[in-house]
Amino acid sequence: NKVDENFIQFIDSKNRKVVDLMLSKMKEYIDVIIPRGGKNLVRKVQELSKVPIIGHLEGICHTYVDKDAELKMANKVVSNAKLRNTSICGATETIIMHKNIVKKFSNTILGNLEKNGCKIYGEKTLAKFYKGKIFRATEKDWSTEYLSSAVSVKIVNNLNEAISHINKYGTMHTDSIICLLYTSPSPRDTEV
């Protein structure tokens, strides 16, 4: 591309005074700041910056496995979305499964996660189908950013219920829907 490499600068300093100076005194020199770091840094930038920022505090991300999903693909996607790097804000924190696939999919998908050290929080209904260890999910789990090898599992009746759950508890960061058939226009296109 023909973008001048000087348009983007990386500030490699952990000195908070440098950050404070950029946030409060550099508005005429800096177009936008993209903070990368922990919640405390991002929160500080959001609260104090006089410079426009692109940032977020949390990533409560969802992966919905729809009734027409293919098991092998769903297992790969869920595994990658949760286990590739559990401590990033883009990792899946809640897996939502359509009720029609829980019996067939849960032991493969959740078993793979558990085998790789992931703690599973699920509803009472999940225990009817999943043979591994389940910790009882509470309301708090739906809005928890674990940032670790833990995941909550929600069972829903349909796509609309999945979308409602994502919209209620998610941070609109990194959500995915796994399905085999894609028809447009669909609620998948506009409601998450």
Task: Show the residue positions of the predicted features.
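Short, well-ordered beta-strand elements within core beta-sheets of diverse protein domains
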Residues: 95-97, 148-157, 172-177
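Residue-level signal for inorganic ion chemistry
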Residues: 33, 98, 162
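Alpha-helix termination/capping residues and helix-transition junctions
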Residues: 27, 89, 168-171
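Residues at or immediately preceding the N-termini of alpha-helices
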Residues: 71, 158-159, 181
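Rossmann-like NAD(P) dinucleotide-binding subdomain of oxidoreductase/dehydrogenase enzymes
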Residues: 1-68
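Single conserved hydrophobic/aromatic residue that forms the stacking wall/gate
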Residues: 182-192
